[in-house]
């Protein structure tokens, strides 16, 4: 089976006894932001391996400037715990700091915190390739604190009330499932939208080649106009249970914040899927993009710039699929010679408009069971 990234399994989990004991201790507390809430969980369960906690100054600047951790392992996105200058002074050098959710619930702890100053302009230019406040990621970072505290973390997963532990499987569990099913190859597929026929077509091409498909939708922090996670989950359930062989796919949600960092985020997503145990990962057109900030294939091309041994997981590059009325089937530009006038293409805006008006979506665009879930949601608004 594929190794964890950095060849290091990470599991920084508190037992219920340790958690209860921690509750009674009188350490300083630090409330984490929404993004940090999900990052903290993923650090603790080992999906950000080899990281064992929030980045220190060396890892932060190395990630931005070298595209690696200070240890030399490939890394693309800074995972930091942002604080004000006043908080940085307060927490720096302490033995432990208790990390809490916005409502005050204890999530875990930060050990031996060390404070350092961030460079937000450098960060947005490196991570997002722009400093335009029109980019949601840039806008977010520039509005945040300029300091960070680094340190190893430990978490108590049941305290993360926003995360469904029955659906957000730990990497040890997914690896166990892949092994029990004798999958030698597993291809990961990420989405933050309902799966329509185009995605289904690409996934089924992948299933003709690989032993297993890991469907891993992102359900952490997304943009305000994205379809809510619970509605998307009903769509995935309707599709997978009716149209996929049950022994060929594994479904789990990924409670990660969406950064809209295009190419760098595609690398981040590939590392997470390697930690889950995937041997391959599908990167489609404009993966993790937003607006027109990235070229359609930049997120695929970035993988060609790394040394061959930088990642064990292999990238599967797909173009957009569509229904061609002339071919009478799903296709991509690689297999269809006909012009766009023969391709069924519905924008997200058009789909939402049709659903709100109760109009049926074409079966060539989406399965009727998925359309029904979406129709009920939009008519309830």
UniProtKB/Swiss-Prot annotation:
Record GO biological process: hydrogen sulfide biosynthetic process; sulfate assimilation
Organism this protein belongs to: Carboxydothermus hydrogenoformans (strain ATCC BAA-161 / DSM 6008 / Z-2901)
MF-aspect GO terms: ATP binding; sulfate adenylyltransferase (ATP) activity
Ranges in coiled-coil conformation: none
Pfam families per UniProt: ATP-sulfurylase, PUA_2
HAMAP family: Sulf_adenylyltr (MF_00066)
Lineage start: Bacteria, Bacillati, Bacillota, Clostridia, Thermoanaerobacterales
Family: Belongs to the sulfate adenylyltransferase family.
InterPro entries: ATP-Sase_PUA-like_dom, PUA-like_sf, Rossmann-like_a/b/a_fold, SO4_adenylyltransferase_pro, Sulfurylase_cat_dom, Sulphate_adenylyltransferase
Catalytic activity: sulfate + ATP + H(+) = adenosine 5'-phosphosulfate + diphosphate
UniProtKB keywords: ATP-binding, Nucleotide-binding, Nucleotidyltransferase, Transferase
Pathway: Sulfur metabolism; hydrogen sulfide biosynthesis; sulfite from sulfate: step 1/3
Enzyme Commission identifier(s): 2.7.7.4
The protein's name: Sulfate adenylyltransferase
Gene3D superfamilies assigned: HUPs (3.40.50.620), Sulfate adenylyltransferase (3.10.400.10)
């Amino acid at each position: 089976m594929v190794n964890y990234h950095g060849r290091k399994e990470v599991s920084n989990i508190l037992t219920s006894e340790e958690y209860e004991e921690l509750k009674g201790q009188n350490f300083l507390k630090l409330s984490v932001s929404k993004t940090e809430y999900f990052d903290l969980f993923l650090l603790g369960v080992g999906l950000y391996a080899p990281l064992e906690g929030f980045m220190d100054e060396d890892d932060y600047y190395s990630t931005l400037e070298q595209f690696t951790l200070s240890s030399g392992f490939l890394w693309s996105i800074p995972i930091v715990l942002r604080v004000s200058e006043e908080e940085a002074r307060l927490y720096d050098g302490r033995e432990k700091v208790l990390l809490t959710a916005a409502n005050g619930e204890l999530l875990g702890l930060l050990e031996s915190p060390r404070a350092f100053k961030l460079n937000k302009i450098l960060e947005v230019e490196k991570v997002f390739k722009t400093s335009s406040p029109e980019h949601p990621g840039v806008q977010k970072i520039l509005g945040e604190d300029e300091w960070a505290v680094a340190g190893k973390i430990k978490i108590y997963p049941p305290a993360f009330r926003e995360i469904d532990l029955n659906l957000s499987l730990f990497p040890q569990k997914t690896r166990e499932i892949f092994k029990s099913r004798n999958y030698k190859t597993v291809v990961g597929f990420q989405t933050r939208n309902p799966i329509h026929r185009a995605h289904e077509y690409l996934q089924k091409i992948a299933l003709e080649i690989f032993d297993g498909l890991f469907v891993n939708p992102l359900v952490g922090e997304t943009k305000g106009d994205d379809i809510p996670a619970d509605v998307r989950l009903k769509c995935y359930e309707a599709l997978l249970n009716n149209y996929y062989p049950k022994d060929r796919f594994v479904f789990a949600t990924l409670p990660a914040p969406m950064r809209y960092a295009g190419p760098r985020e595609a690398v981040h997503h590939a590392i997470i899927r390697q930690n889950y145990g995937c041997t391959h990962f599908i990167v489609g057109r404009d993966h993790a993009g937003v607006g027109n900030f990235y070229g359609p294939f930049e997120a695929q091309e970035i993988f060609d710039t790394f040394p061959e041994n930088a990642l064990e997981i292999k990238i599967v590059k797909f173009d957009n699929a569509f229904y061609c009325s002339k071919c009478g089937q799903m296709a991509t530009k690689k297999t269809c010679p006909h012009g766009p006038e023969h391709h069924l293409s519905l924008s997200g805006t058009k789909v939402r408009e049709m659903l709100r008006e109760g109009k049926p979506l074409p079966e060539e665009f989406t399965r009727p069971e998925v359309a029904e879930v979406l129709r009920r949601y939009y008519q309830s608004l």
